[in-house]
Every structure is written in structure tokens, then in C-alpha cells.
Regions:
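Bacterial N-terminal signal peptides that target proteins for export
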Residues: 1-11
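Bacterial N-terminal signal peptides
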Residues: 9-21
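Signal peptide processing junction and immediate N-terminal pro/mature segment
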Residues: 21-29
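Carbohydrate-active catalytic/glycan-binding domains of CAZyme proteins
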Residues: 28-370
Length: 370
């Protein structure tokens, strides 16, 4: 059994225990002494955070993060990573981490946005993203409505760390999870989104939610994989300017990746950045636990698969963002170093490097593997 499988077995076994609560991360305490097998240490230990979306506003880095709760998954979710609802992940609000640089002290901003202040949302505020335009900061977030369907909402603030005020309705035509907003050099903005299984992409064929749709990927291994969605945003970046379409990910021969290609096909966690005029679309492969990337010449794709950015971390989920700050590139990601529980994560950062040909050097989150 692999190192990752051993850890996953331990996590699943722990879920069957009666005492499912987790002790809180120690408040106002410095990060623990570095352990030799971790490449990076948690940015903060006073709060559990995940799904980091990093941006540079006014020269400072702001990381928009999910806020993991300490309730633990219900006993019905003994395998919460495989069921169709993602019941172990019950996040109700967001946290922002800000810093002068990834190696500087981190300020934790709370009271960013709470589900109680989102009129249309019922539960599960998952991975967010943010953008800036004309003096206003925009927070994009998925949540389930009262029908149990994931929609994507938007909230605004005059300050990068909020508090944000949500609009009364989700973005028209939005569905699934993991919004990632990319502003191109010409000022046009695009949203990438989607996630399989608990993210409901497979329940939204043609953008229409089917509550009785499959809980997981229904496609045969030799069928085209589900693809991420992309849509240009209106000038005010509050709504879609067009109907979402597939952002096609292809292999080196130009053929769409297949559903059975677990090490390369899209699962969730879209991110877009630009490097030397090319569009780098990165994402999580889900069950194989990689962060990988594909490159294209248009924000719509197609994107040709290139390789792995991040090898598997502690915990089941893997989610990331990539940002440039003062001439250096950084990867933000999360693992479960602090808690050892997949639903209680901590955000980390490490420097990212390109090769001369524009490919990205693969990062191992462990200095030495167990």
C-alpha cells in the first residue's frame, strides 16, 4: 500500500470512531517546529483553512480561504470523500490571510462573509475566489441553495479583506463549485468552475441541475472526461456575459482526455494564470491527488496537458492557486498537517519555478517521503 493510501486508511478508520470531534488549532500560537518530511509549514495555526485563492492587491498578498469547521463528518459519511454530498465539508464562512510576502507574518481576517448573510444560500460554502475592478473587491463563492444545488454567488467590498456584502441571488446560469476568476491583459474577465462528485458537475448536464443525477462520474473509462466550465464575465463582473462552455483539455495528440485517465483528467479546483503570453490552466485530478496543468493560446482553450505541479499532500483533497509577487512565483496549497483529518486543513505556500521551455517544475510537498 502506498504512503498516501496508508494515510487515507487511517483517516477513514478514524471516521468510524464515536469521538469524531477535533481539538481546535491552538489560538495565537506560532507554527510548530518544522518537521523534516514537510516541505512547507502552515501559514497560520489559529484557524483551519483550505482552498487558498491568492491575489496581489496593492503589493500585498491576500489569500481567500475556506474555513474548515471542527464538527467532523456525520457517521453516515464514513467515506465522505466518495459520497455525492461532500458532507464532511460543512464550511459556513470565509477567512482571508494577508501578508507582505509568503515568508512574512500573516494577518488573519475574520468576519469576511457568513452564510447567514447570503439570502439564497443554505449550506456548504466551499472554495472561493476574488477579483478587483474599479475600486471594488469581488468575492466569488459556491454554496448550496435550498434545493440542494450548488450555485455560485458574488459579494462586494471596498476593502480587500472585507467584510463583503452578498448579492441577493446567485449568478444567473451558474452551477457546480470552485469559481476561479481570471482577468486578462486586455481587461476581460473569465470565470472557470466545476467539480465532479460532491461538486455536482455530473448533475448539471447542459447547465440544468438534476437532483436525481449520478453521485459520481457516470462516464465509461473510454469516454471523454467531464471538462471544466468557462464563461466570460460582463463588464461589471457580476454576471456571465455568455452561456458557460467546456474548456477542453487535450493530450499531446490533441485528443480530449478520457474519463478513465485518472492521473490527468479534470476533477475540480480550477485555476488560471498567464506566463509568457500562454494560458496555464491548472486543476486537481481528485482521486489520484495531483495538481496538474495544461497550456493553451486562448482563455477558452483548448489546453494541452503538460504535467504535474504538486504531488499528493497529506489528506484527501488538494486545492491550490498560483500567483506572482515581486518577480517570484508562488504556489499556495493545503494539507492536514495540523489535524491529521481530511476535513480540517491548513494553508501553506512554496515557491514555484519554471524551466526554460515554460514547463513547471514538479513540487514534492515532502522533503523526504515516508
Amino acid at each position: 500500500m502506498t504512503r498516501h493510501a496508508n494515510r487515507l486508511s487511517l483517516v477513514i478508520a478514524a471516521l468510524g470512531m464515536a469521538a469524531l470531534g477535533a481539538g481546535p488549532a491552538p489560538a495565537n500560537q506560532d507554527a510548530p517546529a518544522p518537521k523534516p518530511h514537510y516541505l512547507s509549514q502552515p501559514l497560520v495555526t489559529s484557524v483551519y483553512t483550505a482552498d487558498p485563492s491568492a491575489h496581489v492587491f496593492g503589493g500585498r498578498i491576500y489569500v481567500y480561504a475556506s474555513h474548515d469547521t471542527e464538527e467532523g463528518p456525520p457517521l453516515a459519511d464514513v467515506e465522505p470523500f466518495k459520497n455525492s454530498e461532500g458532507g464532511a465539508f460543512k464550511m459556513r464562512d470565509y477567512v482571508v490571510l494577508s501578508m507582505a510576502n509568503p515568508q512574512a507574518p500573516v494577518q488573519v481576517h475574520r468576519n469576511v462573509l457568513d452564510i447567514a448573510d447570503v439570502p439564497w444560500a443554505a449550506r456548504q460554502m466551499w472554495a472561493p475566489d476574488a477579483a478587483y475592478r474599479n475600486g471594488t473587491y469581488y468575492l466569488y463563492f459556491p454554496a448550496k441553495d435550498r434545493a440542494g444545488a450548488f450555485r455560485i454567488g458574488v459579494a462586494t467590498s471596498k476593502q480587500p479583506a472585507g467584510p463583503f456584502r452578498a448579492r441577493p441571488e446567485p449568478i444567473k446560469g451558474s452551477f457546480s463549485i470552485d469559481p476561479a476568476v481570471f482577468v486578462d491583459d486586455d481587461g476581460k474577465s473569465y470565470m472557470y468552475f466545476g467539480g465532479l462528485s460532491g461538486g455536482q458537475l455530473q448533475k448539471n448536464i447542459g447547465g440544468v441541475y438534476d437532483p436525481n443525477g449520478p453521485g459520481g462520474d457516470p462516464r465509461a473509462k473510454d469516454e471523454q472526461a467531464f471538462m471544466p466550465q468557462v464563461a466570460k464575465l460582463r463588464g461589471d463582473i457580476l454576471e456571465f456575459a455568455e452561456k458557460p462552455r467546456e474548456a477542453l483539455i487535450v493530450d499531446e495528440k490533441g485528443k480530449p482526455l478520457l474519463s478513465g485517465d485518472g492521473d490527468r483528467r479534470f476533477f475540480e479546483a480550477s485555476w488560471m494564470h498567464k506566463y509568457r503570453g500562454k494560458y496555464y490552466f491548472s486543476y486537481s485530478t481528485g482521486g489520484s491527488h495531483f495538481i496538474v496543468y495544461a497550456v493553451g493560446s486562448s482563455p477558452y482553450g483548448p489546453f494541452t496537458y503538460k504535467g504535474k505541479i504538486l504531488l499528493p499532500v497529506d489528506g484527501w483533497t488538494t486545492h491550490h492557486s498560483i500567483v506572482e509577487h515581486k518577480g517570484r512565483w508562488w504556489l499556495f496549497y493545503a494539507d492536514t498537517q495540523l489535524s491529521g483529518k481530511t476535513w480540517l486543513r491548513n494553508v501553506k505556500a512554496t515557491e514555484l519555478f519554471y524551466n526554460r521551455d515554460g514547463t513547471i517544475r514538479t513540487i514534492d510537498p515532502f522533503v523526504t517521503r515516508k
